[in-house]
Amino acid sequence: MRSILYAVLAFAVLARSSAVAAFPIPDESRPLSKTSPDTGATRSLRVEAQEVIQSGRGDGYGGFWKNVFPSTNKIIKKPDIKISKLIAAAKKAKAKMTKS
């Protein structure tokens, strides 16, 4: 157990020293770790066209992210598909296949 601790400690020291060696000027490594105040304030985890959908208990959808259809239709048009027509065509094709 102690040997694992020493190995992790040695790895951390080596990783730190190689990171410091990458930046010969000490002040050069600092701007990478700091965020600018304007980008830090405007960050958001949600995409503009998403909303949280809460569902009822036991229906299998425990709350999820869903795109709002009008905004996605601007990018990719949603085709008009009638499910009842597709089911009827599938039944007709299945009946034709079983007769042959």
From Swiss-Prot:
The keyword Secreted applies. Disulfide bonds: none annotated. It comes from the Eukaryota. GO terms for cellular component: extracellular region; host cell cytoplasm; host cell nucleus. Keywords: Host cytoplasm, Host nucleus, Secreted, Signal, Virulence. A motif (RxLR-dEER) lies at residues 43-57. Residues 1-22 form the signal peptide. Belongs to the RxLR effector family. Interacts with the host calmodulin. Effector that suppresses flg22-induced post-translational MAP kinase activation both tomato and Arabidopsis. The perception of highly conserved pathogen- or microbe-associated molecular patterns (PAMPs/MAMPs), such as flg22, triggers converging signaling pathways recruiting MAP kinase cascades and inducing transcriptional re-programming, yielding a generic antimicrobial response. Associates with calmodulin to interfere with plant defense-associated calcium signaling in hosts. The RxLR-dEER motif acts to carry the protein into the host cell cytoplasm through binding to cell surface phosphatidylinositol-3-phosphate. The amino acids 78-82 in the C-terminal region of are important for binding to host calmodulin. This is RxLR effector protein SFI8. The lineage of its organism: Eukaryota, Sar, Stramenopiles, Oomycota, Peronosporales.
